[in-house]
Amino acid sequence: MSYNSFGHLFRVTTWGESHGPAIGCVVDGVPPRIPLSEADIQPFLDRRRPGQSRFTTQRREPDIVRILSGVHGGVTTGTPVALQIENTDQRSQDYANIADRFRPGHADIAYHWKYGVRDPRGGGRSSARETATRVAAGAIARKILGERVRIRGALVQMGRHAIDRARFDWDEVDRNAFFCPDPEAAKAWAEELDAVRKAGSSLGAVVEVVAEGISPGLGAPVYAKLDADLAAAMMSINAVKGVEIGDGFAAAALRGEENADEMRMNEDGTVRFLANHAGGVLGGISTGQPVIVRFAVKPTSSILTPVHSVDSDGDEVDIQTKGRHDPCVGIRAVPVGEAMMACVLADQLLLHRAQCGETGAGRLPLAKK
């Protein structure tokens, strides 16, 4: 197995390289009779598309998606849905000077050691270009989840500077180039990233993804936990080096009573939580609260600043990477994180239906004895 697929029942296989003729994915396990067209997928690709501001790569890709199979008469047929996105703006010559050199912090040397051969053009298979296919698959996953489920992502930290949570406003996310929910932070980030970009360097970031409208009961103990699948999905995104669910690492500093998501009864007999430190998941199973995931994205490895490295002959060299690269790859990771959240939730929904049917006990009020 080459590990180019993820998911259990809703299973996505991606293919293609950064500078190949096209990239794409095959989405298996899509239920039949779901309305689907390219128009349902394209808006999500447009949010991730490169070249939309000076803060992202200037590679100009239209990212137009084509559905090749699995849809007839405007609805899914239950067979694999194949999607293709053409690459139209490659500049492979930009990578000629690093064909035999390994970029520090990049997958170059790891791919070389594993396979004995690699595609240096734009990073080949390890390029963030691959994530466009995940966004396309995520659009299909959203169709399975339905309109009741809302998935939103935001950049909550760039470099050392985090947002002010008191100013968190989801309406601000699509009003700036950073998917930032804090307008003041967005202004400060613009100044800082301009300086970093002009210096030929890059910054890391933290992305937060929140899913609301999730029914209780998704996920299963012990090896199909919802949070385990979410962590694996987010960690599979290029440049991601850490993931947390809910309070995550901050929970280690809390006492037990502080970390507890206390509960009370509503008048209709349903349960309400007084907090959400767990991020909507307990015991690997959704609680009905918002599912909250954050992931850390390292600074872009391809930078103009000269750094020390080695080449394939074993000589020590200095390397300066030309080409068009994101000064902060975390920005365009926001729609990718949303897509991975959607894929995992759709997968877990199908697994839940397979075991428990359309409804589970979590939808019912607690009966008083």
Curated annotation (Swiss-Prot):
Q: Binding of NADP(+): at which residues?
A: R48, R54
Q: What InterPro entries is this protein classified in?
A: Chorismate_synth (IPR000453), Chorismate_synth_AroC_sf (IPR035904), Chorismate_synthase_CS (IPR020541)
Which pathway does this chain act in? Metabolic intermediate biosynthesis; chorismate biosynthesis; chorismate from D-erythrose 4-phosphate and phosphoenolpyruvate: step 7/7
Q: Which UniProt keywords apply?
A: Amino-acid biosynthesis, Aromatic amino acid biosynthesis, FAD, Flavoprotein, FMN, Lyase, NADP
Q: Do you know which SUPFAM superfamilies this protein is assigned to?
A: Chorismate synthase, AroC
Annotated GO CC locations:
cytosol
Flavoprotein among keywords? yes
Catalysed reaction equations from the record? 5-O-(1-carboxyvinyl)-3-phosphoshikimate = chorismate + phosphate
Q: Any idea which positions bind FMN? A: R125, S126, S127, N238, A239, G283, K298, P299, T300, S301, S302, R324
On cofactor binding, the record's note says: Reduced FMN (FMNH(2)).
State the needed cofactors, names only: FMNH2
Any one GO biological process: chorismate biosynthetic process
Q: Which family does it belong to?
A: Belongs to the chorismate synthase family.
Primary role: This reaction introduces a second double bond into the aromatic ring system.
Which PANTHER family did the record assign? CHORISMATE SYNTHASE
Quaternary data: Homotetramer.
Its protein name is Chorismate synthase
Organism the protein comes from: Acidiphilium cryptum (strain JF-5)
